[in-house]
Amino acid sequence: MDVQLPIEAKDIQKLIPHRYPFLQLDRITAFEPMKTLTAIKNVSINEPQFQGHFPDLPVMPGVLIIEAMAQACGTLAILSEGGRKENEFFFFAGIDEARFKRQVIPGDQLVFEVELLTSRRGIGKFNAVAKVDGQVAVEAIIMCAKRVV
């Protein structure tokens, strides 16, 4: 599969099954097969989670940042295998060493940098970092597992 960068949201949807309101990636900006992927998400006050988290102090839920990191990891795995295959999915399988270092608020641009650490028997282990303005917001080790459904 010839990968043309950047990969925009409409084409990300051809790679991973997530859709609004759960698609958390806006663009893929860098990709090296079986090694690294960089993606971005523009955080907007118009996203539904900000109605309740929190109305007077909107903060992006950490669990959604982790989900976005997992989507970036799955996208790295899928692109590294030449694209999405019918009925094949990468599921979030685990997380270790998660650290939340700063809040993410509307107007921020999250930059996700993911690196494949190991891949064995359909399970990938990734180092994932989410940054805002060059500062680490969240970091974690994420596992994704390939399944045919």
From Swiss-Prot:
One of its GO terms (biological process) is fatty acid biosynthetic process. The keyword Transmembrane helix does not apply. CDD domains: FabZ. One of its GO terms (cellular component) is cytoplasm. It is an enzyme of class 4 (lyase). Keywords: Cytoplasm, Lipid A biosynthesis, Lipid biosynthesis, Lipid metabolism, Lyase. Its EC number is 4.2.1.59. The keyword Calcium does not apply. GO terms for molecular function: (3R)-hydroxyacyl-[acyl-carrier-protein] dehydratase activity. InterPro entries: FabA_FabZ (IPR013114), FabZ (IPR010084), HotDog_dom_sf (IPR029069). This is 3-hydroxyacyl-[acyl-carrier-protein] dehydratase FabZ. It comes from Neisseria meningitidis serogroup C / serotype 2a (strain ATCC 700532 / DSM 15464 / FAM18). The gene is fabZ.
